[in-house]
């Protein structure tokens, strides 16, 4: 714009020259014009270089650059539960059909307790997503709709990365656009095969998880603690849980190996996402949960009983930090997509101290 304004001013000078002074002025402007004419080229080159650098900096790492593969055939949480019930209908009673609170909506139900018919005290809510929720999941609307935190699936096993994590992660952390959302990453722990050493397999998965996190900028003090998702590792063909091929002691060893490696590499103690029904099914006695109880518990319980009383059934009466209570939450406005929702029950200050998260 500056270039064209000056050019217009200079071009009008020759027609107005009637004196030596004006000719001198024209010569003076003409000299400046040669210098000014180079400005657009310089600006263009600077813009191109800056754009290239910006794009290079903002381009998320793809799976192949990390030596990994994109997840394509993993089951969503809803599909996992369906497969489990198909393989063993008797579990329907234990799960209470995993009835979900389908009417829970952000932000209306965040502020008001429909069970007690009163404003909801001391409760903070969060969301977790994966590529199953779609690339265009409205992350930017979550904080405005009273979601305090967002967990995103990053990886699974030793070979796979969630194809949307590299896009989700920076969007959730875009504080320059006013997004104040405590973001977190979780890894889906794979059982592997009985031939895989449990401790080594756990550590290898941790290294995959850490690799993905670091490649995407690492953790901030305002981020949620890293999480490991330990649940049904369903074979999509048979509907059977692959963990059934593991001994209870191996499962515990793998969890401990994973969490120890992650804590050593990222400097944050992971939380463990787990369902009581799965623990009883795969590991057995609830007393054994004491071996991993040093970690904060992110408990999954979708049962009618838990939702009615807002008191989930924990494992070995362990105090839970976060409770995932539905996979069918929605936003009141802006999107009709369903997603998983969790709650932290307690004062805001306690939320930060309990989970080791820094306030914005």
Model-based region annotation:
Residues 4-9:
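N-terminal amphipathic/hydrophobic targeting modules at extreme N-termini
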Residues 12-32:
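Short, Lys/Arg-enriched N-terminal segments with co-localized hydrophobic residues
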Residues 32-39:
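Bacterial N-terminal signal peptides that target proteins for export
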Residues 40-49:
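Bacterial N-terminal signal peptides
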Residues 52-56:
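Sec/Tat signal peptide C-region and signal peptidase I cleavage site
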Residues 57-129, 137, 288-360:
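Functionally critical loop-and-helix segments that line ligand-binding/catalytic clefts
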Residues 109-141, 145-257, 264:
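Substrate-binding cleft of extracellular glycoside hydrolase catalytic domains
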Residues 222-311:
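Catalytic domains of cell-wall/extracellular-matrix polysaccharide-remodeling enzymes
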């Amino acid at each position: 714009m500056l270039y064209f304004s000056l050019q217009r001013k200079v071009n009008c000078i020759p027609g107005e020259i009637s004196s030596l002074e004006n000719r001198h002025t024209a010569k003076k402007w003409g000299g400046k014009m040669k210098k000014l004419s180079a400005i657009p080229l310089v600006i263009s080159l600077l813009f191109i270089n800056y754009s290239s650098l910006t794009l290079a900096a903002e381009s998320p790492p793809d799976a192949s650059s990390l030596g990994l593969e994109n997840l394509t055939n993993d089951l969503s949480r809803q599909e996992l539960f369906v497969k489990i019930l198909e393989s063993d209908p008797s579990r329907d009673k234990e799960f209470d059909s995993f009835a979900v609170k389908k009417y829970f909506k952000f932000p209306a139900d965040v502020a008001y307790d429909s069970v007690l018919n009163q404003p909801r005290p001391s409760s903070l809510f969060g969301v977790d997503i994966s590529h199953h929720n779609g690339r265009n999941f409205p992350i930017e609307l979550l904080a405005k709709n009273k979601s305090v935190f967002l967990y995103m699936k990053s990886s699974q096993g030793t070979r796979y990365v969630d194809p949307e994590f590299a896009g989700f992660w920076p969007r959730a952390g875009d504080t320059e656009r006013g997004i104040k959302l405590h973001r977190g990453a979780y890894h889906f722990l794979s059982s592997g095969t009985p031939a895989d050493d449990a401790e080594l397999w756990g550590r290898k998965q941790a290294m995959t998880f850490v690799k993905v996190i670091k490649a995407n900028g690492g953790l901030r003090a305002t981020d949620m603690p890293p999480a490991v998702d330990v649940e049904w590792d369903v074979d999509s063909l048979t509907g059977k849980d692959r963990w059934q091929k593991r001994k209870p002691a191996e499962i515990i060893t793998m969890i401990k190996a994973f969490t120890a490696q992650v804590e050593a590499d990222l400097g944050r103690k992971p939380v463990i996402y787990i369902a009581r029904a799965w623990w009883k099914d795969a590991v057995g006695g609830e007393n054994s949960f004491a071996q991993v109880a040093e970690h904060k518990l992110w408990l999954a319980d979708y049962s009618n009983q838990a939702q009615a009383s807002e008191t989930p059934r924990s494992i070995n009466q362990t105090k839970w930090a976060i409770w995932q209570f539905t996979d069918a939450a929605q936003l009141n406005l802006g999107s009709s997509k369903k997603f998983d929702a969790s709650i932290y029950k307690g004062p805001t200050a306690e939320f930060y101290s309990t989970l080791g998260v820094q306030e914005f």
